[in-house]
Each structure stands twice: as structure tokens, then as C-alpha cells.
Amino acid sequence: MGYYSLTEVTAVQYAKEHGYFEKKANVVCHEIGDGNLNYVFKLDDGEKSIIIKQALPYAKVVGESWPLSIKRATIESKALQIFAKYVPEYVPVVYSHDEELAVTVIEDLSRLTITRKGLIDGEEYPLLSQHIGRFLANVLFYTSDFGLQSEEKRVLEGTFVNPDLCKITEDLVFTDPFGHYDTNDYEPELQLTIDELWSDKTLKLKVAQYKYKFLTRKEALIHGDLHTGSIFSSPSETKVIDPEFATYGPFGFDIGQFIANLLLNALSREEEQRGVLFFHIEKTWSYFVETFTKLWIGEGVEAYTKEKQWLPIILQNIFTDTVGFAGCELIRRTIGLAHVADLDEITNKETRIQAKKQALSLGKELIKYESKNADIQLFRTLFQQTVSGGIKA
């Protein structure tokens, strides 16, 4: 029959035909997706529920003028299965994948809340940083040359060649926000700040280097889009979802994106409410380092993991990349195609514009920052300097 787009009616038919519900079951189905690239259906018969996710052959945020390969659904399904191999507690269960229809049937996580929404609403997730730090350390270590035999890594790397979505990242994260491109989206009040940003040749040279790292450093399997909208949370659980951008890339990319989105939420808050975000930023890194170090010592398969001086160099390189990638994410989420609710839902216009100017300033400083001795406190320090007016866009 070939590919066709599901509806709420045909999603129920599909689920029944594949044995997820009895033929006579009264199944309620709603399209619940708020993303840019897929349909997401929740199906519930009162006793059990599932999620059906279908990749569209175009970007929903733009329309059919932006075609995309539906093979990304297979990449997403495979990525979730790889993640589950190492950290099953931090990802939803994948029940099945239909390559022809680009349909994946997965665990319903309705008991949890999208982390971005929860943070905007003031919810606290005390285990978020512990879980994400450990998730990142396990996935990045075990899919790298340090935790995987080189021939196995090369085979796995070939599985995650993801040209369409990598091109989106190349353009929307590293290129378009730093110049005159139609995809950019921002308030007129930001124009002077943006003009200064676009004329900063030192900044552009640094962004070019980070883009080149993304293009060429195939260090480990990365999620590729690890923002707080790609994570479900509760006070006791954390689940990472939506790895359709998964590919082999730099160790620091996912860490930087996650931290940047915590910083964006911090910018939307009053000063006295920001401490929990810096707690999560600092703990994410400390749990990552702790877990990665244990795996390096106990599970390392590459010969030079036995050299004690090698690990600190690797961790410092990861941190340096984390800082720069976080800066790129701050800027693209402020003036690029895909904004974040943390800033856009600030109701007072003057406050919203000020927060966005601060996001641009902080992003610029993170990208341009150079020090081989920096530690995780750098994010707090530069943030405080930015919001206090010590750093101007």
C-alpha cells in the first residue's frame, strides 16, 4: 500500500490491526503532537494506552515546500533502542517500528510532564540533572571509541547517517542565526542587537569552528536535539524522547544543548528563582564526569584509556565544546526558526525583549570564551555578569 499519513481514525485501525487493542475495543484517539516534524497520536481504551508517532515527509513547521526523508523515523527508533541498551530507565519502551509507514509505537508517558512546561510552571525535578548526566555519560561513552571496539563503532556510525536532519542543525543552529536568512524570526526591538551580533567577525569565526566540529567530529552517538522539550519528567522519573536528529557527532553537543535550555529558563525567572537551574547545570556536569570516569576506568576498551593523563584532557575538550555549543543554542533559540516558550511566553513585552537581549549576549560570550582552566561555574559567572549589565550585546 505504501506510505500514507495517519489520521485519528486510521491510527486506531492501525493499532487494532497490529494487535495493540481488541477489534471491538472502544479506543479513544487524539493527535497530541506539538512538534515541527511529526504526527503524534495517543490511543487509550480505558485499560491501556499507547503512543503512535509518524514521521511526515515534510517539516510541519514550514509545509510541503520543505521535504524531509521519512527514514528519520527509523533512525529515531534505532536510537531509542541503543539508548535502552545502556540506560533503559531513561527512555520510553519501543513496542514496534514500521519502516514503510514511518510509524513507531511507543510507551505512553502521560504520567509525566514535558520538562520545559514543568519548569515554566515552576515545577521542581530534583533528579533531573542526575538522570540526564548519567544518561549522557552512558550513551556517549558506550557508543564512542572508548567504550566500543573501533570496527563496531564504524558499523554503528553508518547506521546513523542522517543527512536531512543534520542539514537542519547545520543551518538552523550554526548558520542562519548569524546572518541575513529568511528562517530567522525576531522582534524589531532586537534589530540593533542582532546587527552587532552579525557584524562580529570574531564571533563568526568561532561559530564556524563549532559548525566544523559538528560536521566532522564523529565521536559518539548524540541525541542531536536534547532540549527540555525532548524530555519528560516527574519528581522521580526522567525519560528522553524524540531522538530523530540522532547521528554521530561531538561529545559536547547534547550536553551544551541541554545546559543552554536550562539557561533560557533561568533568564525567564526572577533572580531568587534561578538557583535550581544552576543546581541542575552544575550537577548535570558533575554526574556526567563521575559516570564517564567510572566507565572509562572500568569499561574502557581503547588501549590508551589506561593512560591516566588522557581522561582529564578528554573531559576538558568535552567541556570546551559544551560551552560553545550552548552559546550557539542560546542564540538560535532566541532569533532563529524554532523559539522556546521560556522566553516567548514572558507576558510583559519589555521584560521579554530584555531577556532575549540577555540570551544573545550570554550566547555570544559562551561562544567566544577561551580558557583551558574553566569549570562548570563558568555558566553561573557569565550569566550573572550578563544579567547585571557587566556584559552587553
UniProtKB/Swiss-Prot annotation:
InterPro entries: Aminoglycoside_PTrfase, Kinase-like_dom_sf, Methylthioribose_kinase. Keywords: Amino-acid biosynthesis, ATP-binding, Kinase, Methionine biosynthesis, Nucleotide-binding, Transferase. Signal peptide: none annotated. ATP binds at residues 38, 53, 107-109, 242-244. It holds the Pfam family APH. Substrate binds at residues 225, 332. Its EC number is 2.7.1.100. Transmembrane segments: none annotated. One of its GO terms (molecular function) is S-methyl-5-thioribose kinase activity. GO terms for biological process: L-methionine salvage from methylthioadenosine. Pathway: Amino-acid biosynthesis; L-methionine biosynthesis via salvage pathway; S-methyl-5-thio-alpha-D-ribose 1-phosphate from S-methyl-5'-thioadenosine (hydrolase route): step 2/2. Gene3D superfamilies: 3.90.1200.10, Phosphorylase Kinase, domain 1. It catalyses: 5-(methylsulfanyl)-D-ribose + ATP = 5-(methylsulfanyl)-alpha-D-ribose 1-phosphate + ADP + H(+). NCBIfam families: MTRK. Catalyzes the phosphorylation of methylthioribose into methylthioribose-1-phosphate. Belongs to the methylthioribose kinase family. HAMAP family: Salvage_MtnK. PANTHER family: METHYLTHIORIBOSE KINASE. Homodimer. This is Methylthioribose kinase. It comes from Bacillus cereus (strain 03BB102).
